[in-house]
């Protein structure tokens, strides 16, 4: 779809759900503080399920994990992950494509005027996506480090064990 031709539709989405498209600062969950974009009420859903997959999974094992997590999402679970490993990416992509609710953790925070783009904007408008950033925004194009990956997975675990 042409970007300019799509402007009126995107504006309508932002007007109908303004809170889903504003950066929310100091959002508290499970004793932690985040910057967020999207449907913060996903954190209040009864079941949050962490998606964490070993990098050593084979393709058939990844497909098995995808099936497992999609079945849980069909039953109402909100999937939570930084989507780092190939398996985590496959699960979150399949769930996103199917329209299931997701909480995505990202390493880089948000600028004040940040907005989700493309299909993420659609997902936010539908209330199916929450993007959380536990750390401040940086302009440098930095590769994520192992310690950050471990921390993001620990944050996902803590969000899911909050009760």
Question: Where do the PLM segments sit?
Answer:
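Short catalytic/metal-binding and nucleic-acid-binding patches
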Residues: 1-32
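Glycine-biased, small-residue-rich flexible motifs in mid-sequence functional cores and linkers
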Residues: 23-163
């Amino acid at each position: 779809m042409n970007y300019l031709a799509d402007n009126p539709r995107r504006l309508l989405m932002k007007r109908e759900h303004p809170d889903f498209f504003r950066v929310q600062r100091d959002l508290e969950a499970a004793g932690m503080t985040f910057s967020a974009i999207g449907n913060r009420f996903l954190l209040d859903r009864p079941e949050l399920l962490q998606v964490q997959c070993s990098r050593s999974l084979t393709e058939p094992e990844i497909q098995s994990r995808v099936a497992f997590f999609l079945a849980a999402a069909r039953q109402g679970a909100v999937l939570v992950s930084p989507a780092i490993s190939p398996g985590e990416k496959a699960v979150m992509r399949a769930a996103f494509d199917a329209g299931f609710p997701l909480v995505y953790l990202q390493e880089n925070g948000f600028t004040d005027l940040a907005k989700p783009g493309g299909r993420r904007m659609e997902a936010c408008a539908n209330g199916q996506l929450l993007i959380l950033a536990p750390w401040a925004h940086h302009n440098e194009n930095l590769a994520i480090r192992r310690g950050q990956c471990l921390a993001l997975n620990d944050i996902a675990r803590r969000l899911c064990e909050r009760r």
